[in-house]
């Protein structure tokens, strides 16, 4: 994200550890951890993180004549280990000048790869290692009326959904679960698990070492 890319952007509660705890880690990386769980299907068990705050001071949002010390991270980079031994990497930034709002992932496997970028929300890039070598390369798979809730917003293919529709789908699923008195995959207990992973990342960034998520389970 780029909402802090301008060093003259006033400091609010999100930039202060006393009110926000962490910066890009808590605000942005939580989404990546949740996405990783869904896509990889394995929990993160160990992390190594490094974070950075390029702009040490910002104007006070309540008094522009004052400067406030920024004590939260503007960007963080993490190596993660999953419970099955696989490794991955994550990064979050709120000072990326060219990416106002972005979320992306890439998975590399022995049989191929998939890539996704939120700014092209209706497209999934797919690479197959089993196709004719002359035809190898990423191919675009487009969302259509046979995929999920797409047809609830679009009468035909190629129309496309956007971020606001995704939020509507989330709200619908949560409210439906409440009215039907059933559990959802993302609940308070899961939120606590994500916080445990984030705390392990924060501890790693502060102490400069690999941290097991299990070390944090009694502190979150």
Set out the residue ranges of the language-model regions.
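Stable alpha-helical structural segments in soluble proteins, enriched in small hydrophobic residues
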Residues: 162, 166-170, 198-207
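C-terminal glycine/acidic-rich active-site capping loop/insertion
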Residues: 38, 52, 59-73, 77, ...
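Beta-strand scaffold of nucleotide-dependent catalytic cores
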Residues: 89-92, 116-117
